[in-house]
């Protein structure tokens, strides 16, 4: 199913990539570098081959470190692209599996769980993030919650059943949660705070029960399983958190103030607007998208079918009324937080309050991504309604074929809403000059446009390059760009040698309109360097 609903991702998996050629090549490099570092020098994982000579460059942006084992498969650029495409499909598949498992554990029937899984994994809003593998990789969120609920013998339908305690599932749930952290804190940090809040509620409930009845709700093995799993989860969170803090310490320009959050905060309208890549709704919402200042982060439609079913699930459901009320409150709270600064009071109280109070939250500059949680809660509400209908089918007196069609209709509708028309551009190939240059090297132009391509090209042997692409401009990269606008001249050559750069690769077909326009025509006589033209590109050797 994931292959079909993400098609044509696996049609030409070695040469094309879903979304665009901005972030996907960068994340393909991330996976490749993680696998490379895992087997060659794991202690220097954070010090990648890009942004030379800086340190901690692997943590310059949100990472997908958890996919490192995939980075062991194959080598070179084509393998990196294939790997990315495969993970892209598997990320959708795992999101379905996670939501399906969670909703089943909560007490829904299989058909309802399938609807919830498809609606969550292939929601229209996610099509706007076809170029963000870290945002698409949400399966661990639902899966860890399913495992933890199962381990604690808890469901919405049957409540807490101590006889069904399974410590092994608890440990597994915490390990999956820890793995989810390694796929990026954009999704992982809200999960961490949700788990922390849930633990606090459970502790209060356990203490209250002990005070009232004199008994413990959780046995020793359950407590030990939570301690073991929680310690691993906490250790991973601290490891990642301190690394990112180190990046900010070394690069103060990496700090994001609340103006970023204000810029990416969606209006209420955004919750009812589909992205352009939605096959069913894309054209229909074109006019509405034009009203959004940044549609990729503001077109947040979770699905018309999902909304209708969730509303029905408020009054008609297999789940208890109090649970439905809590789910509805969760939808409202997460939806309100997702508005960012567009909530009443400019997001304070609200998302901006969390940015000021919760460690790390200020780095989450895109409030609309909380739709991960809003849509999951909507999916659970929807599953409650479908489950109630499914269990009451025999009492309705309808022909079996009719009731079966009615039961399967929501599944068909969410499948149709998940159909994409995502572009799959061809990835630019590395010029022979790139492979011929000695590292450390600099590729010009270095203006942010082609930096992701260069990072991807470097997966063939991982030569050290001064290039790289992130959402902030490191001071060292800014200085290199500024100094080399006059390259080749004595000053720029001396500077590059001092930094440690041995080669400069110039791509003439990309120079137009940049500060390096006309660079190949500049003379090199008397500068103590050599240059060679290779297949239309130039290699300048400084040593």
Which ranges hold each PLM region?
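Signature aromatic-anchored transmembrane alpha helix within multi-pass, membrane-resident enzymes
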Residues: 226-234, 380, 384-417
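Membrane-interface helix-loop-helix junctions at transmembrane boundaries of multi-pass membrane enzymes
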Residues: 208-225, 310-350, 393-401
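Membrane-helix boundary/interfacial segments in multi-pass membrane proteins
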Residues: 128-135, 256, 267, 286-298, ...
């Amino acid at each position: 199913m994931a292959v079909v609903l993400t098609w044509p991702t696996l049609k030409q998996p070695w040469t094309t990539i879903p979304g665009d050629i901005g972030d996907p090549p960068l994340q393909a490099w991330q996976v490749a570098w993680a696998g490379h570092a895992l087997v060659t020098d794991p202690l220097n994982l954070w010090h990648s081959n890009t942004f030379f000579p800086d340190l901690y460059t692997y943590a310059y942006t949100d990472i997908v470190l958890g996919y490192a084992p995939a980075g062991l498969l194959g080598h070179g650029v084509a393998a990196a692209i294939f790997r990315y495409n495969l993970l892209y499909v598997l990320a959708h598949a795992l999101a379905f599996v996670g939501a399906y498992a969670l909703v089943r554990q909560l007490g829904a029937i299989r058909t309802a769980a399938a609807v919830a899984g498809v609606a969550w994994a292939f929601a229209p809003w996610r099509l706007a993030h076809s170029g963000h593998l870290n945002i698409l990789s949400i399966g661990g969120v639902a899966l860890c919650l399913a495992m933890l609920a199962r381990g604690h013998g808890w469901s919405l339908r049957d409540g807490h059943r101590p006889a069904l305690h399974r410590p092994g599932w608890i440990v597994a749930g915490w390990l999956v949660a820890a793995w989810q952290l390694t796929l990026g804190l954009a999704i992982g940090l809200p999960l961490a705070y949700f788990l922390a809040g849930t633990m606090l509620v459970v502790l209060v409930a356990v203490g209250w029960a002990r005070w009232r009845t004199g008994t413990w709700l959780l046995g020793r093995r359950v407590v030990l399983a939570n301690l073991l799993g929680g310690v691993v989860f906490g250790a991973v969170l601290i490891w990642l958190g301190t690394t990112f803090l180190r990046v900010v310490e070394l690069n103060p320009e990496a700090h994001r103030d609340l103006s970023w959050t204000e810029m990416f905060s969606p209006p209420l309208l955004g919750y009812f607007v589909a992205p352009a890549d939605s096959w069913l709704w894309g054209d229909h919402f074109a006019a509405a998208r034009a009203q959004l200042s940044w549609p990729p982060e503001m077109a947040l439609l979770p699905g018309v079918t999902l909304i209708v079913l969730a509303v029905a699930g408020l009054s008609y459901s297999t789940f208890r009324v109090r649970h439905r009320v809590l789910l509805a409150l969760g939808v409202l709270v997460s939806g309100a937080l997702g508005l960012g600064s567009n909530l009443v009071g400019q997001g304070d109280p609200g998302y901006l309050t969390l940015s000021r109070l919760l460690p790390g939250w200020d780095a989450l500059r895109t409030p609309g991504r909380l739709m991960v949680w809003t849509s999951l809660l909507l999916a659970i509400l929807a599953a409650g309604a479908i489950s109630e209908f499914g269990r009451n089918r025999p009492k309705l007196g309808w022909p079996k074929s009719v009731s079966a069609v009615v039961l399967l209709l929501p599944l068909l509708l969410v499948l149709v809403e998940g159909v994409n028309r995502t572009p799959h551009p061809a990835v630019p190939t590395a010029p022979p000059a790139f492979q011929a240059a000695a590292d450390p090297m600099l590729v010009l132009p270095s203006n942010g446009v082609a930096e992701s391509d260069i990072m991807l090209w470097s997966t063939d042997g991982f030569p050290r390059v001064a290039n790289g692409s992130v959402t902030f401009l490191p001071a060292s990269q800014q200085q290199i760009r500024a100094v080399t606008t006059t390259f080749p001249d004595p000053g720029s050559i001396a500077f590059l040698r001092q930094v440690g750069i041995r080669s400069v690769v110039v791509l003439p077909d990309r120079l137009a309109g940049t500060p390096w326009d006309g660079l190949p025509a500049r003379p090199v006589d008397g500068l103590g360097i050599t240059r060679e033209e290779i297949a239309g590109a130039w290699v300048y050797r400084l040593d």
